[in-house]
């Protein structure tokens, strides 16, 4: 089975937290069982018949990209991730949709993203009332953590949008140059990024 055959789980009619948790866990388990452990998913623009350098490990935990409803539904249908920062980056978080209300979540998203991108959290809580559940690829880097109810919840952004603490792209480029020139890394960047979407859901949940 390939990513193209994966049917995005539509969980928008699930209104109870307990059922949402179990459905998401089932989707995560099914995704890992049906695909290989390392999944390449984006056809290469420079190597015909091959994939670019972005991949995901299909046995990991889910993270969430929060959006407004119309963008969420279109992205799930077309297997896209939208940008939620001014440099076309995509930020995802381990904070699950049942942990806080839309207004509180919106404040957290504003603290982590600037006023740019297709999804702009500064426009209000309606911008984060739906979610796409995904698994982060190798092009995501973890850039921060929030502690909520004594639990750690991480934030990750696609590589190039932010740097891990202590990381220096200039040094990396110099090292590659001294090594005789490493192969260029190819991955898709833009307002909409082709990406495996595991599930779509609403944050309007009750206990």
Swiss-Prot record:
InterPro entries: Glycosidase. This is Protein 6b. Involved in tumor formation and increases auxin and cytokinin effects in host plants. Residues 164-178 have a biased composition (Acidic residues). Keywords: Crown gall tumor, Plasmid. Residues 161-185 are annotated as: Disordered. Pfam families: RolB_RolC. The keyword Membrane does not apply.
């Amino acid at each position: 089975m390939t990513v193209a055959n994966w049917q995005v789980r539509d969980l928008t009619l699930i209104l109870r937290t307990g059922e949402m948790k179990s459905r998401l866990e089932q989707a995560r388990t099914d995704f890992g069982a049906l695909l290989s452990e390392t999944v390449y998913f984006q056809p290469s623009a420079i190597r015909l018949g091959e994939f670019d350098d972005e991949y995901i490990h299909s046995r990991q935990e889910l993270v969430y990209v929060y959006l407004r409803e119309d963008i969420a539904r279109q992205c799930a249908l077309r297997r896209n991730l939208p940008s939620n920062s001014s440099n076309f980056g995509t930020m995802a978080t381990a904070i699950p949709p049942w942990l806080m209300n839309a207004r509180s979540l919106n404040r957290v998203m504003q603290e982590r993203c600037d006023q740019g991108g297709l999804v702009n959290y500064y426009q209000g809580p309606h911008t984060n009332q739906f979610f796409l559940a995904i698994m982060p690829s190798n092009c995501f880097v973890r850039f921060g953590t929030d502690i909520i109810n004594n639990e750690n919840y991480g934030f990750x952004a696609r590589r190039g949008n932010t740097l891990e603490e202590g990381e220096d792209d200039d040094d990396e480029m110099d090292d590659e140059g001294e090594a005789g020139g490493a192969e260029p890394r190819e991955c898709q960047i833009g307002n909409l990024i082709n990406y495996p979407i595991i599930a779509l859901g609403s944050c309007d949940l009750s206990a």
